[in-house]
Amino acid sequence: MQAYQRDFIRFAIDRGVLRFGEFTLKSGRTSPYFFNAGLFNTGSALAQLGRFYAAAVVESGIAFDVLFGPAYKGIPLASATAVALAEHHDRDLPWCFNRKEAKAHGEGGSLVGSPLAGNVLIIDDVITAGTAIREVMQIIKDQDATAAGVLIALNRQERGNGELSAIQEVERDFGIPVVSIVSLNQVLEFLADDPQLKQHLPAVEAYRAQFGI
């Protein structure tokens, strides 16, 4: 595990974004942990989050021309990542996002910010079912751009209804890498090393054994 990944897990726990207990997911599964990126909800938290995304961008080695944040959750994530790349990695890159509803007046259209052109890195919080990413892929295709990859905060490494996870399905269907700041592997490693949180390790390991990929 990289230092920034360990720092990100600690940061997510401290912010209440990553919690352990018993949670019912949309899928109906009872999960021993829950990740809610909406709780990165202050200026300093968003700035710090952008630095973690930027570190993961650099680590991934994915070549791209523009960052894209899908509405709505992806918008602040893409902007924070763009700021962090410029301030901390000397990479001043364009970014843009989409509106859920196209606008007929003003600048018009459904895209805001830089033109969506060339190789596009999509920034989002998680991929649950993959539906949102499929919509984004169509937006990129409509602009004659190319998806270079997807970066999310957490890969749950959890299969859907079939044998693959939603992330693996996206990788298979679109032939692009999906990378994350951390995956469940790193969360398990963090729990094993933390005396106060180690109590949650058996439940998370059991969940992984049942639903993991």
Curated annotation (Swiss-Prot):
GO terms for cellular component: cytoplasm. It comes from the Bacteria. Orotate binds at residues 34-35, 128, 156. Keywords: Glycosyltransferase, Magnesium, Pyrimidine biosynthesis, Transferase. It is an enzyme of class 2 (transferase). It catalyses: orotidine 5'-phosphate + diphosphate = orotate + 5-phospho-alpha-D-ribose 1-diphosphate. GO terms for biological process: 'de novo' pyrimidine nucleobase biosynthetic process; 'de novo' UMP biosynthetic process; pyrimidine ribonucleoside biosynthetic process. Its EC number is 2.4.2.10. CDD domains: PRTases_typeI (cd06223). Its cofactor is Mg(2+). GO terms for molecular function: magnesium ion binding; orotate phosphoribosyltransferase activity. Catalyzes the transfer of a ribosyl phosphate group from 5-phosphoribose 1-diphosphate to orotate, leading to the formation of orotidine monophosphate (OMP). This is Orotate phosphoribosyltransferase. It comes from Pseudomonas syringae pv. syringae (strain B728a).
